[in-house]
Structure formats: C-alpha cells, structure tokens
A protein has these predicted regions:
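A conserved acidic beta->alpha catalytic loop
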Residues: 14, 37-51, 96-97
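Short active-site alpha-helical segment characteristic of glycosyltransferases
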Residues: 173-180
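A conserved hydrophobic helix/loop-capping motif in glycosyltransferases and polysaccharide synthases
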Residues: 3-12, 27
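Short, well-formed alpha-helical segments that are part of the catalytic scaffolds
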Residues: 12-26
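Conserved donor NDP-sugar-binding/catalytic core segment of glycosyltransferases
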Residues: 101-129
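Short beta-strand/loop segment that forms part of the nucleotide-sugar
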Residues: 20-21, 30-41, 65-69
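Short aromatic/hydrophobic "clamp" motif used to bind/position activated sugar donors
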Residues: 89
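Glycine-rich, basic loop-to-helix element that forms the pyrophosphate-binding segment
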Residues: 68-84
Length: 234
C-alpha cells in the first residue's frame, strides 16, 4: 500500500522547501508527494531554486506533482486530494519536520486500522511555555477530537470525500474538518512519532499573546463567525 502526501505552499521561502525536500528524501515507505502551489507568478525567479528539479533528484516523475491552484489553504488541500492516486492521505505543512524516518510509513500503516489520525506535536524551539502548548494541543485531540494541520492529519480519502473535505475557507479549514469528523463519530488515533513544527509565529508575536489570540479566534469560529472574518484578525 502507499499514501499521498499533500503540502500547500504559498511563496514559501526557498530554504524551507530545500529542507522539506531533504526530509521527504529521508522518509521510508511508498508515497507520492503533491505540492498544491498558490505562489505568485515568478516568485522563485532569480532565487536559484527549482522545486521540480529538487524533487526530480529524489523521486521518479510519477511520484511527485506540482499542482498550480488558487490561494487558500483549504482550497489548495482539496485540490491536492482531488488528484491523489492513493486512498490514504497525509496533509503536511512545509514548515513541519519529522525526527523519525519511518513517520510517513507509520501513518500509512495506521490507516489500515483507523480512519484518521495525527502525530504528536512538538515545536522546533524548547521552553516551558512552548512545551506546555504542545502538550495541550495533543491532549485537545485526545479528549476533544479536534486536530489542527500542524499535527499532520492523515485520513482515508473515501472518508475525506464523504465529509466534504476541507472546504474553501480562508482559515480554520483544519478545525472545520475536525468538527465534521467529530460529528460523524470518527475518532482520531495518535501516532507515537513527533511532528516538529515552527514556533516562529509565537516568537514573532509573543507566546502568551498568540495563545490568547488563537483561543479567542477558535471560540468565535465555534460560535458562528465566518472564516473570512477570522482571517482578518489572524
């Protein structure tokens, strides 16, 4: 069996993409990679970086796709899922990383037994507050069954399509998907592997300030605020 890895990108820094390609090259198992690319025209021109060339050094042509699409993470992820060859899907952000070379393979195998799952979140920087936020994120999925995109959501394609995918949302597309799965009675399973995500937003805007802001926006979304309204405050 195999799995389709779907990654949305929009003007992603070249160094992030180079690191991400190296991460993919180190992963075990059979998988294809789909980049749902909404980057501005000519964004990478003159930057001495060619995503297709980098991928061609790692994968045979049938194992990767660069899919031009409209901006909007939900739209991009849905577009990637629509062209995925395999029944198993893993949605992975370009600023995420794995410490375990068998992480993608573990997600693929987990979908033999469960319908959807996620990895344990860890930040790329230490500190008591960031470690506590990561712990609370993992406990949130365990007890409330709400997973976010930076936790590496994986799911069977048939189930993903049955609940309507991510939908065309400017933000909170992962939250909406989790709520739909929760209403359908689907329980996320947690893998033992960590997924490492960037703490740059917390560092840039302040850890406490960012945490409070996110909780307020999630509360508003749960209580009927539109994704467009939330995006203006994000």
């Amino acid at each position: 069996m195999a799995i389709s890895v779907i990654t949305p990108i929009y003007n992603e820094p070249c160094e992030n993409l180079e690191r991400f390609c190296a991460l993919l090259a180190a992963q075990k198992g059979e998988f294809e990679v789909i980049f749902a690319d909404a980057s501005e025209p000519n964004f990478y021109e003159g930057k001495n970086f060619d995503l297709a060339l980098n991928l061609s050094k790692i994968f045979s042509p049938e194992r990767f796709k660069i899919l031009p699409c409209k901006k909007g993470r939900g739209t991009q992820l849905d577009a990637g899922a629509s062209v995925a060859k395999f029944e198993k899907l893993l949605f992975l952000h370009a600023d995420s990383a794995f410490c375990d070379e068998g992480a993608i393979l573990a997600a693929e195998r987990a979908l033999d037994c469960c319908e959807a799952g996620y990895f344990r979140l860890k930040f790329d920087e230490g500190g008591v507050l960031l470690n506590l936020i990561a712990l609370c994120s993992n406990l949130r999925v365990k007890f409330r069954n709400i997973a976010f995109g930076d936790q590496g959501i994986f799911i069977r394609k048939s189930l993903f399509n049955a609940v309507g995918g991510f939908e065309n949302l400017a933000i909170m597309e992962d939250y909406k998907l989790s709520m739909k799965l929760k209403r359908s009675g689907v329980k996320f399973c947690q893998l033992g592997q960590n997924i490492v995500t960037s703490a740059r937003k917390f560092r840039r805007e302040g850890i406490i300030k960012t945490l409070i802001k996110m909780q307020i926006l999630q509360y508003k979304f749960r209580n009927g605020a539109s994704a467009d309204e939330i995006a203006k405050s994000y």
